[in-house]
Amino acid sequence: MKICVIHVNCEELSRDYTKLVEKNLDRVKREDTEIVHKYVAHLRRASDTVLAFPILLNKIDVVQRAVEAEAEGCDAVLVACSGDPGVTEARTLLDIPMVGPMEAALHLAAQYGRKIGIVTALDPSWAEACETMADTAGLSSRLAGVESIDIPSPIAFTEGFANPAPVREAIIRAAKKLVARGANVVVLGSAGLSVMASNTELAEVPEMGVPILDTISIGLKFAEVRVDLTKCFNVPVASRVGMFEKMDEKNRRRLVKLFDLGWDAAGQAS
């Protein structure tokens, strides 16, 4: 199968991060899974992934890349961002599975423990976004809390990719606080933290037996399962009753033109 991974970061400025992501995904993917990497077109600053207005703009880029991936023959799409940007919107346009890693990780976490803790970056807006995603997933009653690491993001997501050991220890400190608040399982609410944890073999809170879940790797495995369910049993890629109702081609073209998005029905720039 061929799975497209859409990165919500600037390719040219994220070499160290990209290497860690590729290493992680190569470890967990099936032998017959081919990964195609795509990047959003406009992002240049890391802060553009945590504030509401640039998140909206990034969603448009993600949807475009997802439509493009389907036209190129991909079997599923995974957005490599723990905010799941564009996932809901893309599902209304695609006939292949569209996976949000945070949604996938939260629902998997519910099978590992009763109370879920989320460790994320040192950013108040993103910590609040993580709470919102747990609520959207229907798991707010099972959320033990959200803890941010104690390393500023400009350091964690630059120096950390070259030397992830200090970030690893910061994740452990935050996870222990969540366990003290009742968490039985910890989800990493950050793509960057996820890849640094997995690349330093951090999969549980030391000496506690509490799982720590890498959202990006889980997202890839969910994508593989979703493809199998559709191919083997003809399970629809999403429910077409409700918020994932499929938009017809005529109206899709109309809206792309109306908002001057500059791409055609296959996601290509026009």
What is the predicted role of each segment?
Residues 63-108, 112:
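Glycine/small-residue-rich loop that forms an oxyanion/phosphate-binding "nest" at active or ligand-binding sites
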Residues 1-19, 116-120:
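Short beta-strand segments enriched in small/hydrophobic residues
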Residues 91-112, 201-223:
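Short, acidic/small-residue loops that bind anionic groups at enzyme active sites
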Residues 122-124, 134-191, 198:
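Active-site rim beta-loop-alpha module in soluble metabolic enzymes
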Residues 110-148, 166, 226-265:
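Short, glycine-/small-residue-rich phosphate/pyrophosphate-handling segment
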Residues 6, 189-199, 211-237, 270:
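C-terminal and late-domain segments of enzyme folds
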Residues 51-68, 166-172:
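Glycine-rich, highly charged phosphate/nucleotide-binding loops
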Residues 39-59, 154-160:
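N-terminal beta-loop-helix "entrance" segment that forms/cooperates
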